[in-house]
Curated annotation (Swiss-Prot):
Binding residues annotated for L-aspartate, in chain numbering: 86, 169, 224
Keyword field contains Transferase: yes
Role noted for this protein: Catalyzes the condensation of carbamoyl phosphate and aspartate to form carbamoyl aspartate and inorganic phosphate, the committed step in the de novo pyrimidine nucleotide biosynthesis pathway.
Molecular function GO labels: amino acid binding; aspartate carbamoyltransferase activity
Binding, carbamoyl phosphate: 58-59, 108, 136, 139, 265-266
Pathway(s): Pyrimidine metabolism; UMP biosynthesis via de novo pathway; (S)-dihydroorotate from bicarbonate: step 2/3
Protein name per Swiss-Prot or TrEMBL: Aspartate carbamoyltransferase catalytic subunit
Class of this enzyme: transferase
Length: 310
């Protein structure tokens, strides 16, 4: 089966077969990242523009590395050093970039839906690197790849996602992707950070407290508080948040013995995650970062029309 989409905007738009194809391709391409010479000519002659309106370390760097390992030319643009600071609109930015004939625009934007707006106005492919509190599809894919590598499957897994669900685009992509693949997602967080009706997104259970969500979980995914997306104070204090929704060794002990701990980063140590847990043998956080390069290679490959990789 080939990949039928010009763009990758949201995991909500992808079928189980399409997600499996992307994960299988990422698994195959991950071998390149372990070579002495980490480069193949697959996308030679292609141009990838990384257009970031928000700060990023892991996502932007790994998209750039992914493009270069496939021999594409990667150009990085940040809003703070572009004509955006002079008042240029997204539409005008897109038209000017399109005039330079790129093959793919990878964009991160603070406004939910910005990528759909962009994709309708450009002929090249668009990949969503995060839009507001909507979705972060590459993070969702790399999270699923990390889980699949550990457990050999996604179907039937119990995945606990803890934290600021309302403002987290990672939570939404994980929920869409995992429920499509047959996992059961359990959510916990402060009531002020739990969107009403989120259980309607799929096989999702909203728990009254963190311990209920973590109990017998295969995966414990911790999320940071998205202070930059909150218009008002939603917590009495970080100390109180950590007391009720921070993952420490005692709470982790409620999960299955072979459970893994995950976090999309950046970590706020001592708030949502104790350092002793972040650095323990069950932590898969750095495996997530490593898998991010392979997943983004797969995304670039398939929007350029790549065939399934054996």
């Amino acid at each position: 089966m080939g990949f039928r989409h010009k763009d990758i905007i949201a995991l909500k738009d992808l079928t189980k077969e399409e997600i499996t194809l992307l994960l299988d391709t990422a698994d195959s391409l991950s071998e390149i990242n372990r070579r002495d010479i980490k480069k193949v000519p697959t996308l030679r002659g292609k141009t990838v523009i990384n257009l970031f309106y928000e700060a990023s370390t892991r996502t932007r760097t790994s998209f750039e590395i992914a493009a270069k390992r496939l021999s594409a030319d990667a150009v990085n643009i940040t809003a703070s050093t572009s004509s955006v600071v002079k008042g240029e609109t997204l539409s005008d930015t897109a038209n000017n970039l399109l005039a330079m004939k790129p093959d793919i625009i990878v964009m991160r934007h603070a406004v939910s839906g910005a990528h759909e707006y962009l994709a309708k106005r450009v002929s090249c492919s668009v990949i969503n690197a995060g839009d507001g509190a909507h979705e972060h599809p590459s993070q969702g894919l790399l999270d699923m790849l990390t889980m699949r590598q550990k457990f050999g499957k996604l179907d039937g897994l119990k995945v606990a996602i803890i934290g600021d669900i309302t403002h987290s685009r990672v939570a939404r992509s994980d929920i869409y992707g995992l429920t499509t693949m047959g996992s059961h997602v359990f959510l916990a967080g402060p009531p002020t950070m739990m969107p009403v009706g989120i259980e309607r997104l799929g096989n999702v259970t909203v728990c009254k407290d963190m311990r209920e969500a973590v109990d017998k979980a295969d995966v414990v995914m911790m999320l940071r508080i998205q202070l930059e997306r909150q218009g008002k104070t939603l917590l009495p204090s970080m100390r109180e948040y950590s007391r009720y929704f921070g993952l420490n060794p005692e709470v982790l002990g409620l999960a299955k013995k072979n459970a893994i701990v995950m976090h999309p980063g950046p970590i706020n140590r001592g708030v949502e995650l104790a350092s002793s847990v972040a650095d323990c043998d069950q932590s898969a956080i750095l495996a997530q970062v490593e898998n991010g390069v392979a997943v983004r290679m797969a995304m670039l490959y398939h929007v350029c029309g790549g065939e399934p990789v054996e």
